Amino acid sequence: MRAKATRNIHQFSTYFKNFSFREIKKSMLRKIINLGLPSAMQMLFEVALFTAAIWLCGSIGKTSQAANQIALTLATTTFMFAMGLSVTATIRVGNNKGLMDYKNLIIVARSVFLLAIILETIFGILFVILHNFLPHLFLNMENANQVIENKEVIIIASKLLLVAAVFQISDGIQVVVLGALRGLQDVKVPMYITFFA
């Protein structure tokens, strides 16, 4: 174990030869913190909201919590596509801003927004069409002892999926727009909006 740790330290030490903390400029650190902290707070507010929803459902009962977890898992899975587009928007918009190519920046931003709207609309439609079927994928329907509980979970989860279908589109657009704003280095106003929303 020690030999492996020593080998790893030796491998990485080549990257830090002649490194000094004096090389790090305070102005650059300040800029990174001014961009990173509001973005981190933004994500914290969103995660805290979903965590609070799970906690509240847990206090209501296990069937509500199970149904909420099913709907949240499905919504979060489809939300990852929008998160990927958000990263794309951040990179592409930031790149075009750095090149001062504002015409292409607008084209890129609109393209990513449109792609997010199309994808999230498709997911929303699938949630509406399959809202009674999707909860079955998460439950053991062969267990005779849980038939009544499973039916209750399916009823609640199917209703929650209809709600998720609606907020799927707005949530997808919101995260992609925030990614584009991050690319423009505009992070403080979105942080306040996320806090109050």
Predicted regions and their residues:
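Short alpha-helical transmembrane segments in multi-pass integral membrane proteins
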Residues: M1-G36, V93-F167
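Juxtamembrane/interfacial segments around transmembrane helices
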Residues: F12-K17, Q42-F45, A89, D171-Q174
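Hydrophobic faces of transmembrane alpha-helices in multi-pass small-molecule transporters and flippases
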Residues: K4, S20-A52, T77, F81, ...
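Small-residue-rich hydrophobic transmembrane alpha-helices
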Residues: A67-H131, D171-Q185, V189-I193
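Helix-terminus/linker motif at the lipid-water interface of multi-pass membrane proteins
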Residues: L44-A71, T77, N95, F133-V147
